[in-house]
From Swiss-Prot:
Magnesium recorded as keyword: no
Keyword flag ATP-binding: yes
PANTHER family named in the record: PROPIONATE CATABOLISM OPERON REGULATORY PROTEIN, TRANSCRIPTIONAL REGULATORY PROTEIN
One Pfam family named in its UniProt record: Sigma54_activat
InterPro entries referenced in this protein's UniProt entry, alphabetically: AAA+_ATPase (IPR003593), Homeodomain-like_sf (IPR009057), HTH_Fis (IPR002197), P-loop_NTPase (IPR027417), Sig_transdc_resp-reg_PrpR (IPR012704), Sig_transdc_resp-reg_PrpR_N (IPR010524), Sigma_54_int (IPR002078), Sigma_54_int_dom_ATP-bd_2 (IPR025943)
This protein's name: Propionate catabolism operon regulatory protein
Coiled-coil regions, chain positions: none
Signal peptide per UniProt: none
Origin superkingdom: Bacteria
Keywords: ATP-binding, DNA-binding, Nucleotide-binding, Transcription, Transcription regulation, Two-component regulatory system
Organism: Salmonella typhimurium (strain LT2 / SGSC1412 / ATCC 700720)
Length: 541
């Protein structure tokens, strides 16, 4: 998840980020870095591979760097040879399709060269628009040059790729389309800031009333179905209290959005807080990091608590969230030993750092979220019942998209409008009519990825419309563009719907768990656990 960042108080507090790139990416870094100048000290380095490593090692002897941002083979090279964190820019599916759409306006013979592996999912794009699309992958610069020469010999006229690839393509006299977008680079800066927030927290002071701020509020919870109206009413009710809230819902239903809405609505109701910044909203995914790191993150540690601990120790997330809200995402995946420590903090309203002895009073509202059936986890001994009761004083269940059928078409239209507007393409009546004609397909799909999946699907549709703004949005077109809508959508029993939906997604990616997890917005470990749990449930039935 992306955390909203508040500006540091002065330059000494700022994280130090170095961007390492050449040619086109260097120029994009330069433009985007201006947006983050108030949040970090950003230094551009226009070098690659061994020259960059040599320069950076020499520079680190006298200067501090908290994170490096790089991309492609250059980024992988740096990551394998430097000890400081390297944030790798990876093109999104939207980036790839947008670059191919640009190339498709120039020629029907296109090559795409990507680092290490090709993209099998592009087959649908090729068939739908009758393009001659050849994919290649590379590891070294010599390898990349060979792939470019081979594409040219095969009659390919335009090449899509990263900076190294576009440079080599232009050297060979071919049209080059850069694959990275400003949005992807911007996200890399957010990721780098999140990384430095974790590694430099002991040097950051969070005065009362400042800290990490929310991005969403009650008005961002969209949908006019009865379920969503009831949800907004419940959030408004829960905002009258500071009691712990447990949010349950499937992947992609907006659990953090709901948590932020509760946080914002509560503090907006406080008269003494008018015209003041909201207290901190601090979020952590309990299933995304190891047990030892999660313990240090939540409770902090004293100097010398373990090998590699920082001088002076470090405040934990409970201390940082003092006076505000701590959001514990994927609480169902918290290891049992940490559940015991968390329960003690909630009961005593005080936290003791790892390696410390002095309790530190904390005033924190805890909102937790899970996609798991915690009642089942308790029965199987994987979740403490006393912690469950402490966390679930107030309970909020988010409806899956398939149960909000009245919202599906309006949301699809809204997401499609946004994606088209980003490319300066009008949302015409013919597009609206075509989307309406596809409503039966949209309503029949189970939407295992919920809102996130619908938004991604409409982004994909927008890319295709940017190439052909007046297609016939019929079943045949949708079959090629959105093949997942054609999966058998027979009714499933409530006890098997999650497992079957996961298997559908896994089958779509030919068993590739990494790709399926990325599509669903969960970790590969989480996907594995859910598949294992689903298989066990079905064998027990």
């Amino acid at each position: 998840m992306t955390t909203a960042h508040s500006a540091p108080r002065d330059n000494s507090d700022k994280p130090v980020i170095w961007t390492v790139s050449v040619t086109r990416l260097f120029e994009l870094f330069r433009d985007i870095s201006l947006e983050f100048d108030h949040l970090a000290t950003i230094t551009p380095i226009q070098l690659g591979f061994e020259k960059a490593v040599t320069y950076i090692r020499k520079k680190l002897a006298t200067e501090r760097c908290d994170a490096i941002i790089a991309a492609g083979s250059n980024g992988a090279y740096l990551k394998s040879r430097l000890s400081i964190p390297v944030i790798l820019i990876k093109p999104s599916g939207f980036d790839v399709l947008q670059a191919l759409a640009k190339a498709g306006k120039l020629t029907s013979s296109i090559g795409i060269v990507t680092y290490q592996e090709t993209i099998p999912a592009l087959l649908a794009f090729q068939k739908t628009f009758h393009l001659r699309l050849e994919q290649r992958s590379y590891v070294t610069e010599e390898d990349a040059r060979g792939q470019i020469n081979e594409l040219k010999a095969n009659g390919i006229e335009a090449v899509v790729g990263a900076g190294l690839i576009t440079d080599l393509a232009e050297e060979a006299g071919m049209t080059a389309i850069f694959i990275y977008s400003a949005a992807t680079v911007r996200q890399a800066f957010h990721d780098a800031l999140d990384m430095t927030r974790l590694t430099r927290r002991q040097r950051v002071d969070y005065p009362s009333g400042k800290g990490l701020q929310t991005r969403y509020e009650l008005g961002d919870i969209r949908g006019q179905s009865p379920q969503m109206e009831q949800l907004r009413q419940t959030i408004t009710l829960y905002a009258r209290s500071r009691a712990a809230v447990l949010i349950q819902g499937e992947t992609g239903t907006g659990k953090e959005l709901a948590a932020q809405a509760i946080h914002q609505t509560f503090f907006h109701r406080q008269p003494h807080r008018q015209n003041k910044p909201s207290p901190p909203f601090v979020a952590v995914n309990c299933g995304a990091i190891t047990e030892s790191l999660l313990e240090a993150e939540l409770f902090g540690y004293e100097e010398g608590a373990f090998t590699g601990s920082r001088r002076g120790g470090r405040a934990g997330l409970f201390e940082i969230a003092h006076g505000g809200t701590l959001f514990l995402d994927e609480i169902g995946e918290m290891p049992l030993p940490l559940q015991t420590r968390l329960l003690r903090v909630l009961e005593e309203k005080a936290v003791t750092r790892v390696g410390g002895h002095q309790p530190i009073p904390v005033d924190v509202r805890v909102i937790s979220a899970t996609h798991c059936d915690l009642d089942r986890e308790i029965m199987q001994g994987r979740f403490r019942p006393d912690l469950f009761y402490r966390l679930s004083i107030l309970r909020l269940t988010l409806p899956p998209l398939r149960e909000r059928q009245a919202d599906i078409l309006p949301l699809a239209e809204s997401f499609l409008k946004q994606s088209l507007a980003a490319m300066e393409i009008p949302f015409t009546e013919s597009i609206r009519h075509g989307l309406t004609q596809c409503q039966p397909l949209l309503l029949a799909w189970r939407w295992p990825g919920n809102i996130r999946e619908l938004r991604n699907m409409m982004e994909r549709l927008a890319l295709f419309l940017s190439v052909d703004p007046a297609p016939t949005l019929d079943r045949q077109f949708m079959r090629q563009l959105l093949p997942e809508l054609m999966v058998n959508t027979a009714e499933l029993t409530p006890s098997t719907v999650d497992a079957n939906a996961l298997q559908d997604v896994l089958a779509r990616f030919k068993g590739d768990k990494t790709a399926a997890a990325r599509y669903l917005g969960i970790s590969r470990t989480t996907l594995w656990r859910r598949l294992k749990a689903g298989a066990k449930d079905q064998s027990d039935n």
